[in-house]
Amino acid sequence: LQIKVYHGGSLGLKNEDVLRWLPTGAAEMGLVWANYLGRDAPAMNAVYIQGSVGSTEEHLKAIPVLKDIYAEELKEWGIVPAGFLALPILYASIFCRDEAVNTLEALRTKKLRVWSKDMVETFDKLGVSAQIIGQTEMYVALKTGVVDCAVYPALYAKTVSLQEVTGFASYLYPIAGLPYVLGASEQQWNSLPASMQ
């Protein structure tokens, strides 16, 4: 078995479209993150609402249930969960290009990048213009002014070079990181011998 790994987005396959391209075999495997699935699978997107779990203990109790839900839902899309990558409790901040944003009033004057439908709805109720932009498009969206600010875990900000396109950050809240699912096309998975699965 040979596995060739590609960086997210490098094949032109968008995170938010994974339920559409993975079953077709456009790539045999890919990371599935429920937060990006609000358009195609609203139930999966709503399994773990941002801010609903605030401690490591609560998070660890929820993970087995999340795995079961994911396996059941992904089966309907022709995707097999080959593995899960758990994330720790993270601390989201609002990273902004041109000025610090420390109040809701100031945030209402900005265009904000978020990663899930529930976040769009929450910020909309607060009078903030928010839109889902995938992680692989976030840097360019900030650089070109598509958005002024982005919600992102501070721990991982350097991995996507946010320091190059933003000069300010304000802490927002703790987030329980949804596990990534290493999903495989069911057709591709079933074609492998059991010893390779």
Predicted segments with their positions:
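Divalent-metal coordination cores built from histidine and acidic residues
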Residues: 69
